[in-house]
Amino acid sequence: DATMGKGNDTLFLCELAGEKGKVLAFDIQQEALDVTKELLKTHGKEMQAELILDGHEHMDRYAGKESADVICFNFGYLPGGNHNLATTYRTSIEAIGKGLGILKHGGMMSLCIYSGGDTGFEEKEKILEYVKALPGKEYTVIVNEYYNRKNCPPMPVFIFKE
């Protein structure tokens, strides 16, 4: 889980991984780690996850090449948190690139791009430019849009590594 936030995706990934699986979850805010730790403990999943207080752009320090089946991102800021602490396109694109190296062949990366806020529109544009340029023989990129929602709905993007 490249962007831990409140821990919901971390919990979901722990459930998918099963007892033998391991989930690495990243965030730069201690608040996110504390909330996630409590959520995992409540559900008996705290031993399946390693909660890492570090930026997602450093995930290659913690995971080996082609070692992950799934990598999830939710760009933006911590729900209910400080809006001044948000993802930026530079570190997000760096993290996506490193994540693609960590992803196994046949693996999937999900990106949930929120385009509101001060940096969200630029981040969305830059991330979409980046994923559009990925080699088609190595990756399949699927971009989804909500057509009937207002106020900058999130944009789900899926990248499958061939």
What role is predicted for each listed range?
Residues 91-105:
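A short glycine-rich, Lys/Arg-flanked "PGG" loop and its adjoining helix->strand segment in the class I
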Residues 33-66:
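S-adenosyl-L-methionine
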Residues 72-95:
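Mobile active-site "lid"/loop adjacent to the S-adenosyl-L-methionine
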Residues 22-27:
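Conserved SAM-binding motif I beta-strand of class I
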Residues 81-85, 110-129:
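Conserved class I S-adenosyl-L-methionine
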Residues 3, 102-113:
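Conserved beta-strand signature within the Rossmann-like core of class I S-adenosyl-L-methionine
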Residues 6-20:
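Conserved SAM-binding loop of SAM-dependent methyltransferases across substrates and taxa
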Residues 121-162:
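Class I S-adenosyl-L-methionine
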